């Protein structure tokens, strides 16, 4: 079984130059522009059962005489917010380590917040809170749990965890679509490692798109609030005055890294769909209409020679179409102004994308649109990113020889649940992504398995750990 006989240092200066150039000018810029999805095995047969259904704002308000008394909201929501530690090993590596070794690592810890979604232990947080973690701890009620990472969705910056516990105080659910600008909201989290901190503010805006998500298909329709949110609040709860969840605290706009008046939360209606999909399918189901829209405004109207003398620029402008895609087949054309999706007004790109985010591949939707000043309607069938109407399911490969489970990612093949075999012998870390083997890019997990089961000879394994730090391996299989 032991075919690995040693780890050897490279010795050619050309290899050093090539590794340095490829790392710094090709790979790392790509990694800085993208966000990697991470998952762990789970069973997807049963949907999430919520213990506290949406209340639709029908809980009696607080008896307090003051409109700015948030004690009811705090008392209801604080028990449902947890403290999260993300533990990972940070390696220090330079291209010279290809020659001389010398990589070092140390344990690092970052913290954030999470919200208990169900009484049986499902917790939602931000993807950026746990994306580099090799181990995740949930601190709740003076007890520390090791959490299982069920799945993440970089397109919304959300992640789902699971702890082994029952009868937890699940958060009450409100409706972000019913939330009004100017309404009071309360942010609950653990800023600067201060547990159960409560701040209050109002809803400053809805449907904000601020360009912070680096996924290929980002969905940004944030709730903006002036409630103070600081480092450590990420993944915490944004609730209304009744203590019902309306958003997951996610980001701030700041030049200092601390609160300066602008904070943003993922709407709860989007969050619930993401959680349901991850638990049931292992991945989030995204539905595409086969085109790209931009905001409809004066400048874009001029660009498409549209009438600029209109009372208001309501809707979104169809910029481009995928040939033979759903929108193309439905008769839509670039320059059309989409005003409604299934009767719901969409007056911004973020509103349009949010409306589609609730849909599934195979769903039929009706678009109302303007062409030459005339209103029209058309119905189309949404598809997945592969162009079919099938639901997407996560696919995991296992190999006793490698001693790990594998799955395809945007960058290569990720190895996780490493329990033995070659990868354990080599000391490959959990959530290591294989980018290339013997300088050939890899994308298919089965190809990796076949290689390790059949190949004999020297192997150059190039990849990155969960912190996206490059770690190469050089060894021989016999």
Language-model segments: residues:
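Short acidic/glycine-enriched loop/turn segments that link adjacent beta-strands
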Residues: 154-157, 410, 468
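Short, exposed beta-strand-loop hairpins at the edges of beta-sheets
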Residues: 460-466
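Conserved catalytic motifs of ABC-family nucleotide-binding domains
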Residues: 335, 431
